[in-house]
């Protein structure tokens, strides 16, 4: 039995590469990819992490994995609690109707922040980039926890989105730095083991916090927890970098402002990030308000964003010395298809998940804890299936057909969702929908990351990873905008229709903007009317 198990994980062929910088001629199915390392500047993050591995050896690698686990634990706990507190914060500020707008803006900011942070990590180093992102986290917690108005809370969420973007891209980059290509799909997903536990733990935390000390304290405690847990990997990286410098493995390089801007490709970052932001944020605002399309500045911003994106390719080809999007990416099918697939998959996710938490509390009378269970069962299943997909990729040395199976499961999930996500559905049926969707996404998300990464050199690892994650978060933002548009344009009229003449306009507005203190008692005629409004086909279509 043991011999059979060993043969499964050690198929014919050598897996002699322990890091991507030493792995060449990696075969995926019938496709052979020849990776040729370029010679990046000596102070790049890729060179620094290679020097850290050389100085630290096996012990250093284990310390980095421990640091990554600590960061992932607090990152996932934050992700599964602070994101939930957003529902209660917008309700307390009487702005529940703009929840989708806030989610979309956060997704867009998260998406467009990834390429510049990836570039900074390449120029300055992984540890220095971690310090920047954790600082953004701390500022966001302070602003959100102490906010007196919705605008201050939203401003804090901007910093939160930047911190989340940076931490996510750095975690993905570091784990790719220290793992081989064949094992990368598995190692990339195994870091999400904490996510198999944190949603269930966070459900009890959220339930206690919102019914006790309040969501502000729930956010504020991360201002201490996040830097404490992140300090391990930051200190580990800095200590080994210092040793590598003493051994002359890293050459100290002083950058002036012009050289720094050239290295991070400031012009390309402005065109890429600014272009997407100028296109998507106005579209989001226009979709979630009734008269926003009539404002001239919306069209102007969209046109400016489109022009910026159109200028990206010629700028990167003819002007950029260190392009944030190397032009050969546009001709690399595995990069472009992976980015498009990640975007499309997350459009579906954002559309069907944005108001799921609120919907379950209203239509099924879920407590905050049970709504949390439902909301994150999809992602937990995604993490589990992602690990299995990574092992399967190691065995088969191929990913194309796994991706096809994942897409098919995703489509089956949408079909099941149309049938089962209703007011009359049982709790088991609601969870079945989430699990099927998560299984499909687990395959797809693993495939797109690895397929893109094995097509580039180690020096471009952070860049290509940031672009795939950019596609993911852009898709999530677009999906949230779709959900928000339907919420804004449908729910108020549906509430008026089902509540009838017994409810005045003030009651309709309160139900539309908040769930924390305005829902009628469960089982009453008024509550049944609200449930029918929320679950009516014209409104719930975004969930299917």
Where are these regions (language model features)?
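Cytosolic juxtamembrane N-terminal segment immediately preceding the first transmembrane helix
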Residues: 1-82, 91
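Extracytoplasmic
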Residues: 60-117, 167-168, 172, 202, ...
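Transmembrane core module of solute transporters
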Residues: 67-69, 77, 84-85, 94, ...
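Helix-to-loop junctions at the C-terminal end of transmembrane segments
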Residues: 113-126, 210, 385-401
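Helix-loop-helix hairpins in multi-pass membrane proteins, especially solute transporters
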Residues: 116-267
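Helix-loop junctions at membrane interfaces in 12-TM secondary transporters
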Residues: 146-157, 419-434, 488-494
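Hydrophobic transmembrane-helix bundles of small-molecule transporters
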Residues: 216-340
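Hydrophobic transmembrane architecture of multi-pass small-molecule transporters
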Residues: 255, 449-450, 471-544
């Amino acid at each position: 039995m043991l011999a059979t198990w060993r043969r499964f994980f050690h198929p014919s062929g050598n897996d002699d590469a322990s890091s991507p910088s030493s792995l060449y001629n990696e075969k995926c199915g019938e496709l052979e990819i020849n990776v040729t390392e370029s010679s990046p500047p000596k102070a790049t993050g890729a060179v620094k992490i290679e020097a850290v591995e050389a100085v630290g050896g096996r012990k250093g690698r284990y310390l980095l994995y421990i640091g990554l686990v600590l960061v992932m634990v607090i990152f996932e706990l934050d992700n599964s609690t602070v994101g939930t507190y957003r529902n209660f914060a917008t309700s307390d500020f009487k702005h529940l109707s703009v929840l989708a707008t806030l989610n979309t803006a956060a997704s867009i900011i998260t998406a467009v922040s990834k390429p510049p942070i990836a570039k900074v990590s390449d120029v300055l180093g992984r540890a220095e980039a971690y310090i920047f992102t954790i600082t953004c986290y701390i500022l966001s917690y302070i602003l959100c926890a102490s906010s007196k108005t919705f605008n201050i809370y939203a401003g804090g969420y901007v910093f939160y989105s930047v911190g989340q973007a940076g931490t996510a891209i750095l975690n993905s980059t570091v784990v790719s730095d220290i793992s081989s290509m064949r094992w990368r799909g598995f190692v990339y997903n195994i870091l999400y083991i904490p996510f198999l536990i944190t949603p269930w733990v966070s459900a009890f935390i959220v339930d206690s916090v919102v019914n006790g000390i309040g969501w502000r304290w729930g956010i504020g405690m991360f201002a201490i927890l996040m830097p404490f847990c992140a300090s391990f990997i930051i200190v580990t990286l800095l200590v080994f970098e210092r040793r590598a410098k003493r051994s002359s493995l890293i050459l100290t390089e002083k950058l002036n402002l012009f050289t720094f801007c050239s290295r991070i490709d400031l012009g390309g970052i402005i065109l890429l990030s600014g272009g997407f932001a100028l296109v998507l944020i106005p579209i989001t605002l226009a979709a979630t308000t009734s008269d926003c399309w009539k404002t001239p500045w919306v069209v102007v911003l969209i046109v400016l964003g489109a022009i910026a994106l159109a200028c990206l390719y010629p700028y990167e080809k003819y002007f950029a010395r260190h392009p944030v999007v190397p032009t050969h990416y546009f001709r690399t099918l595995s990069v472009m298809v992976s980015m498009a697939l990640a975007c499309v998959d997350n459009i579906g996710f954002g559309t069907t998940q944005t108001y799921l938490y609120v919907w379950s509390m209203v239509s099924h009378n879920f407590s905050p804890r049970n709504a949390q269970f439902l909301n994150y069962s999809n992602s937990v299943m995604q993490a589990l299936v992602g690990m299995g997909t990574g092992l399967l990729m190691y065995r088969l040395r191929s990913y194309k057909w796994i991706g096809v199976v994942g897409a098919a499961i995703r489509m089956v999930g949408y079909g099941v969702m149309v049938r089962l996500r209703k007011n009359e559905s049982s709790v088991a049926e609601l969870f079945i929908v989430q699990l099927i969707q998560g299984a499909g996404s687990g395959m797809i998300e693993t495939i797109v990351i690895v397929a893109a990464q094995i097509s580039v050199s180690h020096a471009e690892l952070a860049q290509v990873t940031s672009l795939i994650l950019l596609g993911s978060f852009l898709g999530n933002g677009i999906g949230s905008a779709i959900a928000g548009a339907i919420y804004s344009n449908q729910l108020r009229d549906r509430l008026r229709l089902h509540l009838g003449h017994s409810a005045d306009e003030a009651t309709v507005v309160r139900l539309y903007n908040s769930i924390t203190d305005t829902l009628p008692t469960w089982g009453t005629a008024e509550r049944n009317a609200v449930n029918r409004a929320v679950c009516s086909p014209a409104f719930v279509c975004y969930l299917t």
